[in-house]
């Protein structure tokens, strides 16, 4: 039963880290990356479809993405979806493909993006700590119910704390890498 707490807490913390990584990947750094367009959905035959399902996004060069479109009839829909996204991108039709130049970032925009990422990191840390709190509450309830001993309670809480510390370090590492990436340009 304590193992179940470890497993569930670990799974929840992994989901939190994955969600934070996705948020960080969606922040534009001025360098071309196909992940930048992962949040774009295209209105295609009456339903919203992820861009990556109807096209292939590749890095053309350091500051340019190239979208190879599977169905030529969706070209204008894809261009419209990119223009309507909050990414400040201006796609250009180039034959059957779409070229997306990635503009450089201003100092003001970099500072703003760093604040946003730091805020997201803090929210992820809070979520991790809440998972720890819930796990510790369950462990304390087991102690009150005399299901486990005090020694087992302390060992379990230490293990949960170690897990929490590891995941918070992962958040900090992702944050520092993205900050460096933003300040590089």
UniProtKB/Swiss-Prot annotation:
Keywords: Cytoplasm, Protein biosynthesis. It comes from Buchnera aphidicola subsp. Schizaphis graminum (strain Sg). It holds the Pfam family RRF. NCBIfam families: frr. PANTHER family: MITOCHONDRIAL RIBOSOME RECYCLING FACTOR PSEUDO 1 (PTHR20982:SF3), RIBOSOME RECYCLING FACTOR (PTHR20982). One of its GO terms (cellular component) is cytosol. Responsible for the release of ribosomes from messenger RNA at the termination of protein biosynthesis. May increase the efficiency of translation by recycling ribosomes from one round of translation to another. SUPFAM superfamilies: Ribosome recycling factor, RRF. InterPro entries: Ribosome_recyc_fac, Ribosome_recyc_fac_dom, RRF_sf. GO terms for biological process: cytoplasmic translational termination. This is Ribosome-recycling factor. It comes from the Bacteria. It is found in: Cytoplasm. Belongs to the RRF family. HAMAP family: RRF. One of its GO terms (molecular function) is ribosomal large subunit binding.
